[in-house]
């Protein structure tokens, strides 16, 4: 019986992979059975159950995508021996999910009740549409997809049917994809970078935005083949691994060899601990300025009125180490509004000409009507009613804008954060505040191809539950409107 169960599980997962088109831009595989076991999310009868703390978070954030998805998954009767697959197809749907269910009729009843809509037979499959979301059930497999743009029900149903009936070449035929998805982790993801190149090329809005920020084309135009990410829950948190897949002599690796500098955590001496997010990349400014994308970005800034005295070109040339940014949500700021001008922010860069850069910035501020006021050894200015602290510490030029006085410690005194950035030329750190306590995520690349990271929490509790509670609080959405298709 155990052997039969193993073969059955393997068979259904193979079938699901055969439904995912080979030209998908990305695929995520979730080991449902492992996540349920580690999260203790099943009762004695094997039914999916959630602890009260998770239910409370989902209730308070019921419009968040993960909350909605988990509410549905708990009720529809998923096959817990099968994986869940999410993928980004090339056409029609912007993203999609494949889920094996125990009883298709029961699953349909749950979806109809939750959506207020009714299934109908279109293109010989059971189809239900709720706003921009399509549900298709065929032979105990549930397809959920969000339309890329508003389309006729018949086209949506026919496209989903093509996936479910394995009408296309699939990822199952590509060993480079399945090798990554089959690693023994709770979550595996494979991102086809070249597929995103095509998506950007076919999107007028993305193309226009890249013209405004040419530095981003360093990544969007790279010849990386793929990026893989792997996550595994452990007793006290979760571990991550990431890999860049590319040819040894690819232009992207040559670019990194020329522009990356040695990892250095000294910038943390000027990043206040009130910052919730930190990103750092160590670069050689002289080589960086030789790139067309960087020159174009610097020229855009240099052509702004009154900025010639700052000499951005020499600023970039002088960088020899980390460029870092820290962010935290200001009072009254919606975290989903990234462009909000009231975020607290800290910018730092290691420079061979730090003192001269500070002098130029002070002179520029004076020209703009900002007097030079010194407080605790830092230059203090005001921007939109918020204090801005600026200075040079150990060759690190920094500017810190806060909605409060700078009376706090800095991240350099935190060993776990310091160890991450001292070993990784490219690093990321996040601090997430919850009612139970704070949770942390740090991640970095120590070389051109291999990255790793950890998720951990300061409060006791199951890390799977903690992680799900955080996801359930992200990106609350209003009811779908036609504008959300575009």
Predicted feature descriptions by range:
Residues 23-35, 86, 276-281, 323:
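A short, Trp-centered hydrophobic/proline-enriched beta-strand micro-motif
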Residues 35-41, 197-200, 287-290:
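Short, solvent-exposed loop/turn elements at domain surfaces
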Residues 5-8:
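C-terminal motif of bacterial Sec signal peptides marking the signal peptidase cleavage site
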């Amino acid at each position: 019986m155990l052997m039969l169960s193993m073969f059955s599980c393997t068979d259904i997962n193979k079938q699901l992979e055969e439904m995912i088109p080979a030209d998908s831009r990305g695929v995520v595989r979730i080991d449902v059975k492992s996540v349920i076991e580690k999260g203790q999310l099943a009762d004695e009868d094997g039914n999916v159950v959630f602890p009260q703390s998770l239910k409370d978070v989902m209730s308070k954030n019921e419009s968040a995508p993960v909350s909605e998805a988990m509410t549905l998954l708990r009720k529809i009767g998923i096959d817990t021996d099968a994986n869940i697959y999410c993928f980004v197809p090339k056409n029609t749907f912007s993203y999609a999910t494949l889920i094996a269910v125990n009883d298709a009729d029961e699953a349909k009843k749950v979806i109809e009740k939750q959506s207020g809509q009714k299934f109908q037979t279109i293109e010989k499959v059971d189809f239900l549409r709720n706003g921009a979301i399509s549900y298709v059930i065929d032979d105990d497999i549930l397809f959920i997809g969000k339309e890329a743009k508003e389309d006729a029900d018949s086209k949506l149903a026919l496209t989903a049917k093509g996936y479910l009936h394995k009408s296309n070449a699939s990822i199952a035929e590509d060993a480079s994809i399945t090798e990554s998805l089959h690693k023994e982790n709770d979550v595996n993801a494979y991102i086809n970078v070249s597929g995103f190149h095509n998506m950007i090329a076919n999107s007028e809005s993305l193309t226009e935005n890249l013209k405004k920020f040419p530095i981003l084309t360093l990544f969007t135009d790279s010849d990386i083949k793929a990026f893989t990410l792997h996550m595994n829950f452990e007793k006290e948190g979760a571990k991550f691994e990431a890999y860049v897949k590319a040819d040894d002599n690819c232009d992207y690796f040559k670019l990194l060899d020329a522009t990356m500098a040695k990892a250095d955590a000294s910038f943390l001496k000027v990043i206040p601990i009130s910052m919730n997010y930190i990103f750092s990349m160590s670069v050689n400014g002289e080589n960086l300025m030789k790139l067309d994308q960087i020159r174009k970005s610097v020229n855009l800034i240099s052509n702004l009125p009154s900025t010639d005295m700052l000499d951005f070109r020499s600023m970039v040339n002088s960088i020899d180490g980390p460029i870092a940014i820290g962010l935290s949500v200001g009072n009254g700021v919606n975290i989903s509004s990234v462009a909000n001008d009231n975020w607290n922010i800290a910018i730092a860069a290691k420079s061979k000409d730090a003192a001269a850069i500070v002098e130029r910035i002070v002179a520029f501020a004076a020209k703009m009507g900002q007097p030079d006021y010194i407080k605790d050894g830092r230059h203090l200015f005001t921007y939109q009613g918020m204090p801005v602290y600026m200075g040079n510490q150990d060759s690190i030029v920094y500017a810190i804008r806060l909605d409060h006085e700078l009376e706090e410690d800095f991240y350099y005194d935190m060993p776990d954060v310091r160890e991450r950035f001292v070993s990784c030329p490219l690093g990321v750190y996040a601090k997430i505040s919850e009612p139970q306590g704070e949770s942390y995520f740090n991640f970095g690349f120590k070389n051109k191809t291999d990255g790793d990271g950890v998720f951990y929490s300061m409060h006791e509790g199951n890390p799977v539950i903690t992680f799900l509670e955080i996801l359930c609080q992200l990106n609350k959405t209003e009811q779908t409107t036609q504008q959300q298709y575009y």
